[in-house]
Amino acid sequence: MSFKDLRSFIDHLESQGELKRISHPVDPNLEMTEIADRVLRAKGPALLFENPVGNDMPVLANLFGTPKRVAMALGKEDPLALREVGELLAFLKEPEPPRGFKDAIAKIPMFKQALNMPPKTVRNPPCQQVVKTGEEVDLTKLPIQHCWPGDVAPLVTWGLTITKGPRQKRQNLGIYRQQLLGRDKLIMRWLDHRGGALDFKDFKEKHPGERYPVVVALGSDPVTILGAVTPVPDSMSEYAFAGLLRGERTDVCKAISCDLEVPATSEIILEGYIDPDEMAEEGPYGDHTGYYNETDSFPVFTVTHITHRKDAIYHSTYTGRPPDEPAMLGVALNEVFVPILRKQYPEIIDFYLPPEGCSYRMAVISIRKQYPGHAKRVMMGAWSFLRQFMYTKFIVVVDEDVNCRDWNDVIWAITTRMDPKRDTVMIENTPIDYLDFASPVAGLGSKMGMDATNKWEGETDREWGTPIVMDQAVKDKVDQIWADLGIDDAPTL
């Protein structure tokens, strides 16, 4: 099942008991965060606040608050099915010519999917049913959430920022938080390595002093939203990838004030520009780390047009100490990363980003070890292969007999198969998340790799331990007689 707009997905979630409408008045200032946080931690439904205090526009929260709902947004019922998305991405990143007739037949479905890539331009789009310009533009009339007591101002959190660089044919979609600065101004907090910031940098070099057109879409269809947070190849538009996932082309329309294309079924569109000479101090804000971050200077986004659907819905979220919505999104997208990594490193058995590690700061990888030093090669590969892992501070590599998603197994491997000096890799002066205040310098810090695999000849001179394993015949016999032993239900092993 695919969803052409946010509303059809909301209806589907409600029919499945995955969305709750809240008619009681709730304040976007702090109260929504507290309610959404409690519901998310209880693995509860998405929330539609129908009567936000001081506003008549409903607010949608916790949309992707469970891995199951992330899968549902992509037409899947099980998060594990998202590995199919990863297989598609792996193919797109490194397409291989068919190795023969049978292989060509097997690849036909992927080639057919590729035909659905280009977005489709539509007229009279829903997102432009209402158009506001000039004095009508007033961001303070949107129910923008003020998430935490120490936040400096309300924060736009789920906006898809649409940019285009002078050297790129494709448009870039990214999600960057935006601080409310005034009636028509937001602070665009994009880090230097993100697509929007790179497009802006290229534009400034080619057109010094000129205004840079930017559009922000709120409440787009769920597939396009998820396309913006998925590791799409740099040469490919997120619109095209969303079309692949949906099985049909993404509907877009031309923005009113510039040539950028926007998702046609979005709830709200903010159009405007960034003046390269206008910067503002952003923050502090509570973030996905569970702490308030430092302030810093970022570009100011001036909004010249607001367009929206009739009876528009405002899509929002909060970030805080895991679990939060980004952490749940990370759990689901974990399954997307596995096939991509396996294509480059076939020896990888599984890959896990623990949500309590802020989604990406720690990774555990199980491998089929084949030679001395193999674990270190995999560490280096994981750090460098995908941009998403450049901020991963800790990588633990374990053998295939260890479940990398079970901390009991992982801690056992670390404490029995590691010598701290021999098996720990420390790398200094590497890129680190700007929000990581534990690093000695903002944006620059160290990484640690831990080789918790069995050691081979050349890695140790000692006789290595043999794991204790019961004979299978004995286990089978005990299974047969268990009911006669008078013991409670057999434990699951």
Swiss-Prot record:
GO molecular function list: 3-octaprenyl-4-hydroxybenzoate carboxy-lyase activity; metal ion binding
GO annotation (BP), single = ubiquinone biosynthetic process
- EC no.? 4.1.1.98
Domain of life, per lineage? Bacteria
User: Is Cell inner membrane a UniProt keyword of this protein?
Assistant: no
Q: In which pathway does it act?
A: Cofactor biosynthesis; ubiquinone biosynthesis
GO CC, any one term:
cytosol
The UniProt record gives the binding positions of Mn(2+) as: 172, 238
The free-text cofactor remark is: Binds 1 prenylated FMN per subunit.
Q: What is its main location?
A: membrane
* Active site per database record: 287
Cofactor(s) demanded: prenylated FMN; Mn(2+)
Print the keywords alphabetically.
Cell membrane, Decarboxylase, Flavoprotein, FMN, Lyase, Manganese, Membrane, Metal-binding, Ubiquinone biosynthesis
Q: Please give, as recorded in its UniProt entry, the membrane topology of this protein.
A: Peripheral membrane protein
Task: Summarize where prenylated FMN binds, as residue positions.
Answer: 175-177, 189-191, 194-195
The chemistry this enzyme catalyses reads: a 4-hydroxy-3-(all-trans-polyprenyl)benzoate + H(+) = a 2-(all-trans-polyprenyl)phenol + CO2
HAMAP family listed in its UniProt record: UbiD
Q: Which family does it belong to?
A: Belongs to the UbiD family.
Q: What is this protein called?
A: 3-octaprenyl-4-hydroxybenzoate carboxy-lyase
Q: Which gene encodes it?
A: ubiD
